[in-house]
């Protein structure tokens, strides 16, 4: 999902907004109601936009090795703060489902970075998409302890919701003051290698990817064109991969300034085709328990993907048979609870802490999941991220305290 905590976190400067109401948010999912949500992406959809206002763009490649139990992601974050300061960051995580100490995390600032259409370059790093828009190569040695060199190849079509996959904030869609956008390659073959080590913890991982084995990747390209705690108060993200199916959920709920509006995008595919792109999904948190920092963290999650088949035309949507798939799993393996406030500069922390109820945490899980479709069950692995950002939109006087 959009890792707004990493790299571009300074974009959170600002205080809470007035209570605008639902008419000030224009979800991409609403524009496809009564239509076929699934649109095939083009290469142009994955071009870096690099606007001159506050934004964070991320290019994230999740990988899942069904044979060894390894998962993780490699990511580049490109952020622009108020149109004045642009930064870029490489982040990487690898994690083993059974040997939970067998994990490595790194985050490194990038130098001399540049954008060329769909491609991104920096010292000792490159992300390059081929002209046909079927493959992406990711290479990085920016961290001397982490070597990444893999290529993903699309197994199914790329996905966007509607012709324009952006959700807009503001009273005028043609001149919005904020936006959120996601485009996906939900299921990809992956080949190459990852070599990572952490001498302090005595962890060394050498992972070889091959298209002939049960190795899969999910690629999401995202842009958040506004301050994160204004855009959303919570997120739910799921990347499920099995030998036969992929299911992806990207869901966020706005703060009450935008009427607690939920926008959810679901994708279900098999090994060769997109089965459905769904925009009426239900992510159920089962047995939530308030933890030591005050958030209701579920012990299990069940996601119902509800929509229509991907091959239904707009004119036939009303009479189309419903599509339904359920993906569920216990959240037993907490990879990390990321304390967002511990990661940001003091000045920004003072501002954000002045927004009452703002205590952002990201919970990352990796567990066994099961997908059910037409009475057929498929077991696989799921990477799930649950993010809590804020409970309120009220502002305290301390929001203005820069000390």
Swiss-Prot record:
A GO cellular component entry from the record: cis-Golgi network membrane
GO biological process, alphabetically ordered: ER to Golgi ceramide transport; response to oxidative stress
Region (Peripherally associates with membranes): 1-18
Keyword Endoplasmic reticulum carried by entry: yes
First and last residue of the signal peptide: none
Alphabetized InterPro entries for the sequence: Ceramide-binding_SVF1, Svf1-like_C, Svf1-like_N
Record localization: Golgi apparatus, cis-Golgi network membrane; Endoplasmic reticulum membrane; Cytoplasm; Nucleus
The entry's keywords: Cytoplasm, Endoplasmic reticulum, Golgi apparatus, Lipid transport, Membrane, Nucleus, Transport
Gene Ontology molecular-function annotations: ceramide binding
Superkingdom of the organism of origin: Eukaryota
Membrane topology: Peripheral membrane protein
Main subcellular localisation: Golgi
Physiological role: Ceramide-binding protein that may transfer ceramides from the endoplasmic reticulum membrane to the cis-Golgi network membrane, and is thereby required for the biosynthesis of complex sphingolipids.
Family membership: Belongs to the SVF1 family.
UniProt name for this protein: Ceramide-binding protein SVF1
Gene encoding the protein: SVF1
């Amino acid at each position: 999902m959009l890792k707004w905590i990493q790299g571009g976190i300074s974009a959170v400067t600002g205080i809470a907004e007035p209570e605008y109401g639902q008419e000030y948010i224009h979800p991409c999912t609403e524009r496809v109601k009564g239509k076929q949500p699934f649109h095939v992406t083009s290469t142009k959809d994955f071009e870096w936009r690099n606007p001159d206002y506050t934004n964070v763009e991320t290019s994230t490649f999740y990988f899942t090795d069904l044979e060894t139990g390894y998962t993780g992601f490699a990511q580049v974050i490109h952020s622009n703060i108020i149109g004045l300061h642009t930064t870029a960051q490489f982040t990487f995580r690898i994690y083993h489902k059974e040997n939970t100490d067998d994990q490595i995390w790194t985050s490194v600032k990038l130098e001399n970075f540049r954008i060329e259409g769909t491609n991104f370059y920096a010292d000792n790093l490159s992300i390059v998409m081929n002209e046909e828009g079927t493959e992406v190569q990711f290479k990085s040695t920016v961290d001397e302890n982490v070597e990444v060199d893999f290529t993903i190849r699309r197994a199914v079509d790329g996905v966007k919701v509607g012709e324009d996959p952006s959700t807009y904030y503001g009273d005028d869609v043609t001149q919005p003051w904020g936006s959120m956008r996601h485009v996906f390659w939900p299921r990809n073959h992956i080949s190459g290698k990852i070599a990572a080590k952490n001498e302090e913890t005595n962890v060394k991982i050498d992972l070889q990817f091959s298209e002939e084995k049960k190795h899969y990747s999910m690629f999401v390209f995202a842009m958040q064109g506004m301050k994160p705690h204004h855009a959303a108060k919570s997120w739910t993200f799921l990347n499920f991969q099995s030998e036969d199916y992929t299911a992806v959920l990207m869901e966020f709920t706005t703060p009450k300034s935008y009427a607690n509006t939920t926008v959810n995008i679901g994708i279900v595919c098999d090994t060769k085709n997109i089965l459905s792109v769904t925009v009426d999904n239900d992510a159920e948190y089962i047995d939530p328990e308030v933890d030591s920092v005050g958030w209701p963290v579920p012990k299990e999650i069940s996601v119902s993907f509800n929509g229509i088949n991907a091959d239904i035309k707009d004119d036939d949507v009303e009479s189309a048979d419903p599509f339904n798939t359920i993906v569920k799993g216990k959240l037993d393996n907490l990879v990390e609870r990321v304390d967002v406030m511990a990661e940001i500069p003091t000045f920004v922390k003072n501002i954000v802490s002045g927004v009452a109820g703002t205590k952002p945490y990201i919970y990352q899980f990796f567990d066994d999941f099961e997908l059910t479709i037409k009475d057929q069950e498929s077991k696989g692995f799921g990477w799930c991220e649950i993010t809590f950002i804020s409970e309120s939109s009220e502002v305290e006087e301390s929001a203005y305290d820069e000390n």
